[in-house]
Amino acid sequence: MADKKKFPNPAFFRARTEMDWRAQAANLKEVGSIALELIKETDWKAFGKKQKDHFLDNMNRVAREARAVAGMSCAQRKDLLLNGEKQLGTLYRKGDMATVRREWRGVESTLIDFAGWLKTWGMLLGTFSKDLIPALNTTFWYRWMISYMCCVSFMDKNTMGQRGNALRMSHLMTYDIFRYVAENLVFLAKCDKKNGNSSELNKKVVLFDEMTMGQIMAGFPDLLGIPYQLMPVFLVSEIDQLTCVPYIDAVESFGLPADCCPVPSSECGALVIDALPHMGKCFISSSMPCDGSTMASSYMSRRFPDLPVFHLCFPVRYEDEETVQMGAEDIRACIKFIEEQTGAKWSWDAYFSAMKRFNEETRYELEKWEVNKTAYPQIIGPSYELFRKWNYEMDGGIDPRVMKTCRKVNDLLMQSYQ
């Protein structure tokens, strides 16, 4: 029965928001003044010259590509038409981070790529439209939200050079990650006290440190577990490596040594300059992946003193029987903490239902490893690595929709291998 329920709970999207419109107007006024100042300080002559140079460079590139095609033999043109281009480095202009045009992958693979592109855009627009105003308003509160506008370009980079089933598999896996991120961005916007301010939804939100395994929320099907720093700090830095620089700079100016790990440093910096939403019923911190997370938890407690915090201390020697018992007791205490803070009750049925899915997803993952150990690996590239990282840590069998993706990817994998 649990698998037949819609996921995530539609009631989470329908939760009523209580936006302070005066605060939104004041923030919009401040953003407008910053934008006006940027416009005034822009060197428009240099900007115009750069656009002119780009235009001339594009004209030269088109002429160069036309000459290259004209100089090909019939067999080479047929190969280009069916299998796509091979010199992918020419898609980048010197000094630019974006490609000058989309990759030509051959007729079939270009259609596959375009279909995946359309599907992703449709999902993103559909998800954000579930509560559009708070979602879009996030861009006026937090700089990291702007970087998500580049997510489809990020997908293109992760699939560069791929063809056929390899491209299909990458699109399937990327779609699930993007859907998870889009849904949680909407929830962050709805719950944030500066933005949507939904007290109805905040009562059901349990925040946890981004490196804390999300499986603990499988036993609370009526609650919403969100890896708190994942979207504002960690995942967005995969898309835009410059996003976290202001946060690291801020926390080092605050006195944090510069030799700390940049992950917790970025989290602390985001707290220092108020770049994280104020939301949730409680927060679960942990010592994963290192002691830096413990440091970040102290910043979290100081920034939001009204948010109850439970510290999970995972044992390093996890194969030792005594540490396993200690870890189990800590998990039990964490479950009790969530029950006390939210009023929800732990469900073993819901938990084991999710773990059954997770075990099945892990079995599919091991099959990928077996194929990739051979001389004919079928699934490679960043999309595969990112999907696995997200699946085992953030999802962990909780979302029943992921099972369908795992089956599709496995079918394509074996079809290509055989």
Please name every model-derived segment.
Residues 222-236:
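N-terminal glycine-rich anion-binding loop in soluble enzyme alpha/beta folds
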Residues 232-326:
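Active-site and donor-binding regions of nucleotide-sugar-utilizing enzymes
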Residues 24, 323, 327-330, 354:
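Amphipathic alpha-helix face/heptad-repeat signature
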Residues 210-226, 298:
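Histidine-anchored nucleotide/phosphate-binding helix
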Residues 207-212, 285-289:
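Structural motif
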